[in-house]
Amino acid sequence: MEDNTASNKPTSRVIDSLHSQIDDLKTELETVKISHDDYKKKYVLVSQKNDSFVDQLANAKHENDMINALLKRKERRIADLEDQYNELSSSNESLQLNNKNMKIRCENLQQSSASSTAEYERLKIAYDALIASQVEYKRHYQKELNTLASKLEAYKTENKQRFQDLSSKLSSNDKDIDTLLDSMTNKRKALDNLYVNKNKTILELLTSLAKAAKIHGLDTKSTLEENTVAISSLLEKYPDLQEKILTHEKVEVDLDELISESNETLSNCSFESEATLVNSPELSDSASQSKNADHLKQDVKASSLSRSNTLQAKKRKNKRNSVRIDSKSGPDFSSITTPTTGQFALPKKPTFTSNNDNRGFSSRSPSDSSRNITPPHQDYEINPKFQNQNVHLNNDTNNKGGNYNNNNNNRSKRKSLYGGQYNSKRNSQIIDPNALNISMTT
């Protein structure tokens, strides 16, 4: 029992100490709760103050932004005002300078006005003197004009009489012109006949030349065929013929290439088509074109002659009209060149010289008149165009009238001199060089 009592005493002490600690803790807890409530109230108050401070800070920030924007506007306004001030100051300086310049200019204008006034007075005096001299000159020239008018009337009367005399002389000269035109027309006909005969002769010569060239080509072709066959047979008989030629003759010959070229030449060479000299389509086309060109030339020459005759009737001065044949505008007959290709063409016309009414043909060289047939080597230089002779009727009389019936008759005869009936006859004999082509392609 004593042991139990002894053991219970420390436990009661522990319990008492624990109760006392619990009581302390309770009191401490109550104090902590009270302080917690106080702190909680303070926290609420502080949070409310913090919110109010945040709102005040936002308002202050907004006010600061507004103040900054206002400050920037003020600064920009100040900068603009400074620029305006600088501009106004510069414009003020320029205006002051302009004012000074205007003052100087005004002084100069006043001086020039004074000098202009003095010049005006001087010019006025000179003008009055000029007016007086003009009146004197007008009176003098009026007198001269009256004298010239009387002389002009006398000159008109004299020229009228002279014009009548020249008209009578012109009517007598028209007969001589008609006679000369008739003689020139007859000589022109004879010249056209000579051209026709010459072209026929050339046509025959070219025909015989084409036939001879064809015969010569056929002979050459047959000879080439025989030589090709002979070389082929020799190669078949002696396969080493090329080496033997090289050893004995010291010449390297490619017989296969030679035979192939010969066969190609024989296959490409043809003499079946003949060139016609009269009935070729090129010749008929060229003849129709030449006729159309002749008709066009006749119309142009007729209109030019009508105008020239009108002008000639106004410019006759001498007693007799002179007929001059310009040698530069006459036909050009040059020498015939030797042909070198398969295409043939007509030779040029012989040179023709004329001295007033005397005409002559230059003699041909023996080489031109030769009829020996040679292979073609060069094209003939062709000049099929025959320019009509320009007959210049130099009338030296200067009258404005004349016998218009005689002028019309002379005009028709001059047209007949340039007419196309003789040109068409001669142009029909012109040979188209395209009709003389011989196909000899190698």
Curated annotation (Swiss-Prot):
Belongs to the SHE3 family. This is SWI5-dependent HO expression protein 3. Residues 313-322 have a biased composition (Basic residues). The keyword S-adenosyl-L-methionine does not apply. It comes from the Eukaryota. GO terms for cellular component: endoplasmic reticulum membrane. GO terms for molecular function: RNA binding. InterPro entries: She3. It is a peripheral membrane protein. RNA-binding protein that binds specific mRNAs including the ASH1 mRNA, coding for a repressor of the HO endonuclease. Part of the mRNA localization machinery that restricts accumulation of certain proteins to the bud and in the daughter cell. Required for the delivery of cortical endoplasmic reticulum into the emerging bud. Residues 280-291, 301-312, 332-343, 351-361 have a biased composition (Polar residues). It is found in: Endoplasmic reticulum membrane. Keywords: Coiled coil, Endoplasmic reticulum, Membrane, mRNA transport, RNA-binding, Transport.
